[in-house]
From Swiss-Prot:
Residues 41-156 form the RGS domain. The gene is RGS10. This is Regulator of G-protein signaling 10. It is found in: Nucleus. Pfam families: RGS. The lineage of its organism: Eukaryota, Metazoa, Chordata, Craniata, Vertebrata. One of its GO terms (cellular component) is nuclear body. Interacts with GNAZ, GNAI1 and GNAI3. Associates specifically with the activated, GTP-bound forms of GNAZ and GNAI3. Residues 23-32 have a biased composition (Low complexity).
Length: 181
């Protein structure tokens, strides 16, 4: 089972992460460590599924996970093509995050809240202004605290430790971490 986990892990990594240009294997010469990417910008963090997972864990502890969930829901919404699906998703976003009765209400300016009537004619950018507000809230508030958090620093230390391990040990350690979390 352990060998299958390592094998699956290896298959998921892009070829550029597995071999250098000379064909030699290198775990310590990854393009850029994930924590370094995350620390570079909130955008980088939100583009990385592992980064989103860690950021959500942090926000959950801070009782503000709804911010990243709203941001992600808006990103999904912008990619939708089907009008009926857009209407359903728009109503879901509104009821979950924006209405006065929302279960996970986000903190946006009062005038920025959408009127329910606008949900009947959705368009991909209808939540953009609100999404930008939440992004900036995360960027200038939660994100900076995340970069100083034990959660982030622990992940960074783990990456640094793995950098010093031979390839087989690194893959085994990653597989162990993935299947034990």
């Amino acid at each position: 089972m352990f060998n299958r986990a390592v094998s699956r892990l290896s298959r998921k990594r892009p070829p550029s992460d597995i071999h250098d240009s000379d064909g030699s294997s290198s775990s310590s010469h990854q393009s850029l460590k994930s924590t370094a990417k995350w620390a570079a910008s909130l955008e980088n963090l939100l583009e990385d599924p592992e980064g989103v997972k860690r950021f959500r864990e942090f926000l959950k502890k801070e009782f503000s996970e709804e911010n990243v969930l709203f941001w992600l829901a808006c990103e999904d919404f912008k990619k939708m093509q089907d009008k009926t699906q857009m209407q359903e998703k728009a109503k879901e976003i509104y009821m979950t995050f924006l209405s006065s009765k929302a279960s996970s209400q986000v903190n946006v300016e009062g005038q920025s809240r959408l009127n329910e009537k606008i949900l009947e004619e959705p368009h991909p950018l209808m939540f953009q202004k609100l999404q930008d507000q939440i992004f900036n809230l995360m960027k200038y508030d939660s994100y900076s605290r995340f970069l100083k958090s034990d959660l982030f620093l622990k992940h960074k230390r783990t990456e640094e430790e793995e950098e010093d391990l031979p390839d087989a040990q690194t893959a085994a350690k990653r597989a162990s971490r993935i299947y034990n979390t």
